[in-house]
């Protein structure tokens, strides 16, 4: 065999590896973490992407067994299609998610976020104790399991698609350290896309904590109110009933809605909440945003 043949390995993979060794090395290209800046956000507010706040992802559903979604298209506005896998999430779980995201936004997205469980519970207005800690752990698992695809349009043209090519979870993952009673939570950096272009609602946290226990519909409507700057807001009752995942008869929904609007008036989120008939003869909820 000639010297030339001895100098080159017979395997193509071996030759490729030899070429790589003699080429100048390149520094690995890694993710550059970036902190998410949300104009107007402070300790007085919690932020939620508008497409999430307008959808039925979080809803004032009854306690107990939750509906399980498998590739379900959630109820939302016509400019967004949200496909969801996971259990139906409620308003208490919305509180947890908003608070975790509030802490995560202080760091580059993707970095581990330390969350003390007792501090988290107190911040969302709950007690501390074994029952609450178990509830929080179940919620962390539910939020980590929850997976969604968000597709948004503007004037009928594609505007945003998140979660189809790469999965998107409400929480990417977490680890609990019992010795420190602390969670280390990871948030997918793709959430930056859903908060982008100021497409987020600022929820007044102090007012949310003042909403009475059992008034989850009021909490859900507070999030909806925050998605629009319009001074007077109108929502068809049929649309609102579906958005709130309220499956009892309309007559019961009207009563519950009146109570929720009164609660939001009490904590000064809205004013002059009422149900009236529009020019098409359809019932709608109307209120002024404060």
Q: For the regions a protein language model found, what residue spans apply to each?
A:
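Charged, alpha-helix-forming regions
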Residues: 1-290
């Amino acid at each position: 065999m000639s010297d030339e043949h001895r100098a080159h390995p017979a395997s193509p993979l071996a030759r490729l590896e030899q070429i790589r060794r003699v080429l100048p090395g390149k520094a690995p290209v890694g993710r550059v973490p970036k902190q998410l800046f949300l104009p107007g956000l402070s300790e007085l507010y919690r932020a939620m992407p508008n497409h999430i706040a307008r959808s039925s992802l979080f809803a004032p559903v009854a306690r107990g067994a939750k509906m399980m979604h498998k590739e379900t298209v959630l109820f939302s506005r016509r400019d967004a299609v949200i496909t969801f896998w996971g259990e139906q999430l409620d308003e208490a779980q919305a509180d947890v998610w908003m608070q975790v995201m509030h802490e995560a936004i202080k760091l580059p997205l993707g970095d581990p976020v330390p969350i003390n469980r007792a501090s988290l519970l107190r911040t969302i207005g709950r007690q501390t104790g074994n029952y609450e800690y178990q509830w929080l752990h179940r919620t962390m698992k539910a939020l980590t399991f929850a997976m969604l695809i968000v597709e948004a349009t503007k004037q009928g043209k594609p505007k945003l698609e998140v979660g189809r090519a790469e999965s998107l979870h409400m929480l990417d993952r977490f680890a609990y350290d019992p010795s420190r009673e602390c969670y280390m939570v990871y948030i997918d950096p793709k959430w930056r896309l859903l908060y982008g272009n100021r497409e987020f609602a600022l929820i007044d946290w102090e007012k949310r904590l003042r909403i009475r226990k059992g008034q989850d519909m009021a909490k859900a409507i507070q999030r909806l109110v925050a998605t629009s700057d319009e001074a007077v807001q109108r929502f068809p009752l049929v649309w609102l009933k579906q958005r709130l995942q309220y499956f009892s008869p309309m007559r019961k929904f009207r009563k519950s809605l009146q109570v929720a609007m009164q609660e939001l008036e009490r904590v000064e989120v809205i004013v002059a909440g009422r149900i009236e008939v529009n020019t098409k003869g359809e019932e709608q909820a109307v209120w002024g945003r404060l």
